Swiss-Prot record:
Residues 8-127 form the MaoC-like domain. GO terms for molecular function: (3R)-hydroxyacyl-[acyl-carrier-protein] dehydratase activity. PANTHER family: HYDROXYACYL-THIOESTER DEHYDRATASE TYPE 2, MITOCHONDRIAL, HYDROXYACYL-THIOESTER DEHYDRATASE TYPE 2, MITOCHONDRIAL-RELATED. InterPro entries: FAS1-like_DH_region, HadA-like, HotDog_dom_sf, UPF0336/Enoyl-CoA_hydratase. Pfam families: FAS1_DH_region (PF13452). It comes from the Bacteria. Belongs to the UPF0336 family. This is UPF0336 protein Franean1_6066. One of its GO terms (biological process) is fatty acid biosynthetic process. SUPFAM superfamilies: Thioesterase/thiol ester dehydrase-isomerase. The lineage of its organism: Bacteria, Bacillati, Actinomycetota, Actinomycetes, Frankiales.
Length: 151
């Protein structure tokens, strides 16, 4: 069944800020196998001019919680996650994410397009501090297999 195009343009904003913590950064760095001392050692991060531990660039994927109320989680969209594969994910950092940041995430379903028998959903994200500073932007593409409307 084709996805509900009425969802394009819908935005959702997290109600609770995402708390960037030192241990969360360290765990993520270990999980991706990155030994960069800026991700693990507070003194090294401070010596490099940062306020605290620096998060790896892809760390922001952990700031997109499933309970955010993402457009892709709304049953009325018609997305069946058993048919979904991850297509692409990109982040543009305007400054490093550091321990102590409190981030508000806004997600918008930017587009749904047909590619053959599949549909590609692109969701855009804005990560701002609780004071409104834009820290990063991102996009995520999901492929919904076999759901494109017939031609």
């Amino acid at each position: 069944m084709p996805l509900n195009q009425d969802f394009v343009g819908r935005s959702y904003t997290s109600d609770v800020p995402f708390q960037v913590g030192r241990e969360h950064i360290r765990q993520f760095a270990r999980a991706i196998g990155d030994g960069n001392p800026l991700f693990r050692d507070v003194e090294a991060a401070k010596a490099a001019g940062h306020a605290d531990l620096v998060a790896p660039p892809t760390f922001l994927v952990t700031a997109i919680p499933g309970d955010l109320g993402l457009p892709t989680n709304d049953p009325a969209l018609g997305l069946d996650y058993s048919l979904v594969v991850h297509g692409d994910q990109r982040f543009t950092l305007h400054r490093p994410v550091v321990a102590g940041d409190e981030l508000v995430v806004r997600s918008t379903l930017a587009s749904i397009r047909s590619v053959g028998r599949n549909e590609v959903l692109v969701t855009s994200y804005e990560f701002t501090t609780t004071s409104g500073e834009l820290v990063a932007e991102g996009t995520c593409s999901l492929v919904s297999r076999g759901t494109a409307p017939p031609r």
